[in-house]
Amino acid sequence: MSTKIDGKQIAAEIKTNLAERVNRLKAQGIQPGLGTLLVGEDPGSMKYVAGKHADCQEVGITSVKKELPADASFDDIAATVRELNEDPACTGFIVQLPLPKGINENAIIDMIDPAKDADGMHPYNLGELVLHVRGDISTPLPCTPRGVLELLDAYDIDLNGKEVCVLGRGITIGRTIGLMLTRNAVNATVTLCHTGTRDVADHMRRADVIVAAMGSAGFVTPDKIKDGAVLVDVGISRVYDEEAGRYRIKGDVDKACYDKASAYTPNPGGVGPMTRAMLLANVVEMAERHA
């Protein structure tokens, strides 16, 4: 029987631990704070940011909210990033993406103080990840890849020497999780598949673990996986449900795969809660470094 990897449960346990650590920091006169910069009124982004601040309240982290209109200029956004860099109440912060069309997102991310980069996506922090194949990393790690590894570890899924097929080469998940999986502490062998990969299904069938991060609903089907594979579903697609008359979130993994797998993350309810928990963990760890 396959094991359902419950991201909600593990994230809740992590948040309980974080709340205890926040209380210890407060006893030392240190108050962790998460800042968010939201530009525009995209419903998805607004919901996501609201969820992050609800998480903050749950563990005792201060919320620092910055909002700009959709027509904000590059200079307006840059000035707000500088404010967050200098705000002592903000231990770490994120710029909610995507930014409005025409704004250079990479240039904005470059302006974030690496020590306050709660998403772990600043070029300096990514460079630290590339350089440190062995030993501990003291800089923030990308939230979703970190969440995936924490989730698998919580279920005692050993990746040492395992063949891992990563579907998707985006910087948020695909490329960064490849770096983390190949660190000496994890020691997996990674195949990174993308739009230029030939015979993707052949790579998938050889894999002990598949990390699907394509955003292609139901791409991973039973005929493309081997018996006993571990399936990590990170992809998100909005698919219209004609019966319900509304859109639903669907992952990259077809649910028909679950019986063939040894373990799987549901979507939603698998990796998503862990991403949010890792954002909080990054903020708490930033505060602990200054304790």
From Swiss-Prot:
Task: Report the EC code(s) recorded for this entry.
Answer: 1.5.1.5, 3.5.4.9
Name of the coding gene: folD
A GO CC annotation recorded here is:
cytosol
- GO MF: methenyltetrahydrofolate cyclohydrolase activity; methylenetetrahydrofolate dehydrogenase (NADP+) activity
Q: For NADP(+), which residues are the binding ones? A: 168-170, 195, 236
Name of the protein: Bifunctional protein FolD
Gene3D superfamilies named among the record's database cross-references: Leucine Dehydrogenase, chain A, domain 1 (3.40.50.10860), NAD(P)-binding Rossmann-like Domain (3.40.50.720)
Q: Which CDD domains match?
A: NAD_bind_m-THF_DH_Cyclohyd
Reactions catalysed: (6R)-5,10-methylene-5,6,7,8-tetrahydrofolate + NADP(+) = (6R)-5,10-methenyltetrahydrofolate + NADPH; (6R)-5,10-methenyltetrahydrofolate + H2O = (6R)-10-formyltetrahydrofolate + H(+)
Which sequence ranges form a coiled-coil region, renumbered to this chain? Answer: none
Pfam families recorded: THF_DHG_CYH, THF_DHG_CYH_C
The annotated pathway is: One-carbon metabolism; tetrahydrofolate interconversion
| Annotated S-S bridges | none
